[in-house]
Amino acid sequence: MSTILQNVPAGQKVGIAFSGGLDTSAALHWMKLKGAIPYAYTANLGQPDEPDYDEIPRKAMLYGAENARLIDCRAQLANEGIAALQAGAFHVTTAGVTYFNTTPLGRAVTGTMLVSAMKEDDVHIWGDGSTYKGNDIERFYRYGLLTNPNLKIYKPWLDQLFIDELGGRAEMSAFMTKAGFGYKMSAEKAYSTDSNMLGATHEAKDLENLDSGMQIVQPIMGVAFWKDEVEVKRETVSVRFEEGRPVALNGVEHANLVELILEANRIGGRHGLGMSDQIENRIIEAKSRGIYEAPGLALLFIAYERLVTGIHNEDTIEQYRDHGRKLGRLLYQGRWFDPQAIMLRETAQRWVARAVTGEVTIELRRGNDYSILNTVSPNLTYKPERLSMEKVAGAFTPLDRIGQLTMRNLDIVDTREKLAIYTRTGLLSPGQGTAVPRLSNDDETK
């Protein structure tokens, strides 16, 4: 039986994820007029562009909500954000610059916590503002049904009647004004923005054109570092981790993760740290483009990865990175709480993060330009005396290395025999002027 309702569920309670913006305001009032009983739920995710959270539920009641609740999701979001950092759950990168999956993390928290609040009010129909072309419609669908298996989904933007009557922002603004609310449509930006405490996403409209760059974006979590007139002074900052969790910035410990992340945002934001321009694959495989901000997570990740590489061996780091990319994709797809994601996350938290204790000192400059000045940890396996070129008591002797190299003869002989087999079968051809074989199609590429 379908869990998606295509018409207004008149006479029934409908929970709506309410942001206070024009879209959800018009949808809530429209549903009320069509006979539904709307309940409004607003997630406080520490959005940097939200000036007054308490005003949002009051708006919802004014527009016809039977009840309106503000759900503080910040502590949970902070915990999930640090879990993602510990596991390196970030798969979208361009030339080493990372997107920190801040929107998928926000959806995981919003989708579960709002639906849990709805269950408390005996509300089992949920609507939100996600469109059918995006990722969020699937993320919210999964998280909603994981939290409440009896949930039904009603999205006004999938209801043809709503689209016919209020198909655009101008129509919504006129509808609210006619209803006596005097709702003024805000000026259209050249892109849309979605944010939470961990980061901000700017996309759509002019940013869909690849000839429009980061320069058209007005950052909300930091400075426009690319502008010559914006002064950015170099700054030295220290980040301390204990068993994989960040605990102090510049020697100042913070009582909770929320406060620490907010302070990390302020520090990184002064430099425009963590901004990136990414082309990515949406869940439906179509490509989209976004400009991202995440100054705090970027700062913490620099320190965390420095400690990871100084503490763990190569094979552990390889597994951490491979699993992190897989976990990042699962997070992006709305599968953060699926068993396969929990397995990868728990492994990284237990066997990688728990050993990460120490402090990293970083010099921040402009944008993503930085230098690591010092790394201190009781768990470092980096020991310079082992490889020192000075005359010191080494961990091994020249004779030890001769023996190690001699043992390599076994696999070198095996490799030569395999190359000879490939040459006889025509896969390789003898190199010109060298004993090293060449691929048989090397000449064809010239």
Curated annotation (Swiss-Prot):
Keyword Amino-acid biosynthesis tagged: yes
Binding site for L-citrulline: 99, 135, 139, 192, 201, 203, 280
Pathway assignment: Amino-acid biosynthesis; L-arginine biosynthesis; L-arginine from L-ornithine and carbamoyl phosphate: step 2/3
E.C. no: 6.3.4.5
PROSITE patterns: ARGININOSUCCIN_SYN_1, ARGININOSUCCIN_SYN_2
Binding locations of ATP: 17-25, 43, 129, 131, 136, 194
GO biological process: argininosuccinate metabolic process; L-arginine biosynthetic process; urea cycle
GO cellular component terms given for this protein: cytoplasm
Catalytic activity of the protein: L-citrulline + L-aspartate + ATP = 2-(N(omega)-L-arginino)succinate + AMP + diphosphate + H(+)
Pfam families registered for this protein in UniProt: Arginosuc_syn_C, Arginosuc_synth
Gene Ontology MF, one: protein homodimerization activity
Annotated keywords: Amino-acid biosynthesis, Arginine biosynthesis, ATP-binding, Cytoplasm, Ligase, Nucleotide-binding
Chief localization: cytoplasm
Amino acids binding L-aspartate: 131, 135-136
Disulfide-linked positions: none
Superkingdom classification of source: Bacteria
Annotated HAMAP family: Arg_succ_synth_type2
Self-association and partners: Homotetramer.
Family designation: Belongs to the argininosuccinate synthase family. Type 2 subfamily.
Protein name stated in the entry: Argininosuccinate synthase
Organism of origin: Variovorax paradoxus (strain S110)
